[in-house]
Structure formats: structure tokens, C-alpha cells
């Protein structure tokens, strides 16, 4: 019994000493400065540029609104410019001075509000040429308005990208590097969004925003051998009177018809920025029972670099 008491006393004293040591360490003069500097170094390390290599084909959700950075063949194309896009890219080390283009799924405010911030952040990263922005008909006044907001910022400009050839069922060719192509499907009718398809080395990524139609998703995937998708969706189950975004059931049904091998649902309405919304969304998506479909927030990645598309969800 005495031995047991001695052991318990020793353990108690050790715990008290450890707790006391931590308390003294955190409350010593200058401790707050050390903590701040340590956290600042961690933030700087996370924001350090981390571009994908030339063989990679990946897409990263960069904000709670429309913002997906696609990196393929050493090139980078941003789909959507929602609120917080620049901050999201910077925080993940994905802001690039050599961003090849921004392509807008639609011209609604939530898809374009981040354009001025992107222009300024890309300039700060070292960009010198105007940032090209592609989008549906009506994009010119949107870019003019964004440039007007940047009028006081020397050297910061956006320019309207010129789409290439309309290839009928194969979509509108928006961007072609000779290795990577970006095609748009739909978006010719007022209020309708574009669905984009990015192709690299026989693999395809379909990206659909809130204003997309199910038929556009199916059309965009036509002829693809290995395909995955990042699809926006809304849920009237989670938000009353939600009618501004393609219903999750419709988006997933289209993804099934398109035979997408992996499906990342993002951005979503209601927004995953709302506490508890992301887990609720994961339950909703799981309830649709579509193989390979998951809901993810900012930082989630879909990777097509290897043989089979893979999704990595952010913590």
C-alpha cells in the first residue's frame, strides 16, 4: 500500500510540475511575442508558392464561393472569382504571377466580386501583364467595372480574353496551349451559366457552377475517357426557397449519367462557411447514394495525375 501511495504521489507531483512549467512558460515576459512570431512563421510557410509540377493535373477549391484553381501541364486556370478568392489562394500557396487565365461560370455578383482582389494579388506576386478573364456574353462591362474599381492602383489591370472556335458538340474552345484545353458548354442564354471542361493527357475535369443545367454537365463529359467533376449545388432541404443554384439531386443525377469517376460537390448553398453546414451537406450528398460523390469545402483537392481520380478533403 505504501509503495502504491508513493507511486501515486510521484505521478501527482510530476503532473503538477509539468502543468506549472507550461503555465510559467506561457506567462513569462515575451511569451506572447514568441507565440505570435511562431504562428506568423507557420502562416508564411503555408502561403509560400507551391505550384504543381508539369506532370500534375489537380484542382483545388480555394474559397467558399466560386473559386477552383486548375493546375495541369504546368499551366494554371482559375474557374470563378468569388469573394475571398485571392485570400484563399494566398493562404494555400497557390497565388501565381503566371496565372494563365480566369474563366467565369457566369456573370452573377458572387462569381465576379473577387476579380479586383485577384488583380491586386497577382500584381503583388510579380505579374506584369493584364490578367485575362473569359466568360459568357456580357463580360465586357463586368471587366470595365472591375478595372474602374482598380483605377487608383498603378499597374493593376484585367483584360477580356478572346474565346477561340465554337466546335459544336465538342464545345466552345476557350483556351488551348497545345497541351491543355479548356472548353465551355452552354452559357449562351441570358442567366445561364457555362460548364467548363479541362483536358490534359486523355483526362477530363468538368467544373459546373450554380447556374449550370444538368444537360450541360452531361454534354461536357461526352467522349471523355477518364473524367471527374467539381459541381456546385443547392439544397432546398437545408435552405428554404433555395432556387438560385442547381439542385443537388439534379447535379448528381447528371454526374451519374456522365459517368464521372469522382465528384466533389463545391461550392454549395447554403454556404459551408455556416457552422455545421459542411457536415449537413455531407449527409445530404451521402443520402443521394451516388458512388464517388462527396461534399468538400475550401482546400479540398481533386487529383487526376494518376490513373484514377482521387479526392482529398480539407480538414
Predicted segments, located by residue:
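Active-site metal-binding motif and surrounding structural segment of the metallo-beta-lactamase
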Residues: 83-134, 162, 222-230
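Extracytoplasmic/secreted envelope proteins and their assembly/folding machinery
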Residues: 86, 96, 115, 119, ...
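Sec-exported extracytoplasmic/periplasmic mature domains
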Residues: 120-124, 148-151, 256-257
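Active-site neighborhood of phospho(di)ester-bond hydrolases with catalytic His/Asp-centered motifs
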Residues: 78-82, 99-111, 134-136, 205-211, ...
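Solvent-exposed, acidic/flexible segments
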Residues: 78-79, 92, 107-112, 136, ...
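Cap/insert and terminal regions of metallo-dependent hydrolase folds
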Residues: 2-23, 211-300
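Acidic/polar short surface loop at catalytic or gating sites that assists cofactor/ion binding
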Residues: 32-33, 136-167
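Core dinuclear metal-dependent hydrolase active-site scaffold
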Residues: 3-10, 17-95, 162-222, 298-315
Amino acid at each position: 500500500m505504501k509503495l502504491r501511495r508513493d507511486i501515486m504521489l510521484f505521478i501527482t507531483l510530476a503532473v503538477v510540475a509539468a502543468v506549472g512549467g507550461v503555465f510559467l512558460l506561457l506567462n513569462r515576459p515575451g511569451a506572447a511575442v514568441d507565440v505570435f512570431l511562431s504562428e506568423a512563421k507557420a502562416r508564411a510557410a503555408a502561403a509560400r508558392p507551391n505550384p504543381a509540377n508539369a506532370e500534375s493535373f489537380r484542382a483545388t477549391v480555394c474559397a467558399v464561393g466560386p473559386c477552383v484553381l486548375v493546375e495541369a501541364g504546368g499551366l494554371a486556370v482559375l474557374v470563378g472569382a468569388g469573394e475571398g478568392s485571392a485570400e484563399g489562394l494566398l493562404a494555400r500557396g497557390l497565388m501565381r504571377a503566371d496565372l494563365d487565365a480566369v474563366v467565369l461560370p457566369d456573370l452573377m455578383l458572387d462569381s465576379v466580386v473577387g476579380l479586383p482582389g485577384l488583380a491586386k494579388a497577382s500584381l503583388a506576386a510579380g505579374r506584369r501583364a493584364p490578367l485575362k478573364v473569359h466568360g459568357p456574353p456580357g463580360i465586357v462591362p463586368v471587366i470595365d467595372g472591375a478595372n474602374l474599381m482598380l483605377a487608383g492602383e498603378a499597374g493593376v489591370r484585367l483584360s477580356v480574353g478572346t474565346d477561340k472556335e465554337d466546335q459544336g458538340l465538342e464545345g466552345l474552345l476557350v483556351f488551348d496551349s497545345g497541351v491543355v484545353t479548356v472548353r465551355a458548354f452552354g452559357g449562351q442564354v441570358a442567366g445561364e451559366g457555362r460548364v467548363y471542361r479541362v483536358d490534359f493527357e486523355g483526362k477530363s475535369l468538368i467544373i459546373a457552377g450554380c447556374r449550370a443545367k444538368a444537360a450541360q454537365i452531361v454534354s461536357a463529359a461526352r467522349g471523355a475517357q477518364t473524367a471527374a467533376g467539381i459541381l456546385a449545388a443547392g439544397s432546398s432541404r437545408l435552405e428554404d426557397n433555395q432556387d438560385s443554384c442547381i439542385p443537388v439531386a439534379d447535379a448528381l443525377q447528371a454526374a451519374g449519367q456522365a459517368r464521372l469517376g469522382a465528384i466533389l460537390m463545391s461550392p454549395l448553398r447554403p454556404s459551408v462557411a455556416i457552422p455545421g453546414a459542411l457536415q449537413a451537406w455531407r449527409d445530404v450528398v451521402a443520402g443521394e447514394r451516388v458512388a464517388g460523390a462527396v461534399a468538400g469545402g475550401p482546400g479540398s483537392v481533386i487529383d487526376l495525375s494518376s490513373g484514377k481520380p482521387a479526392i482529398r478533403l480539407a480538414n
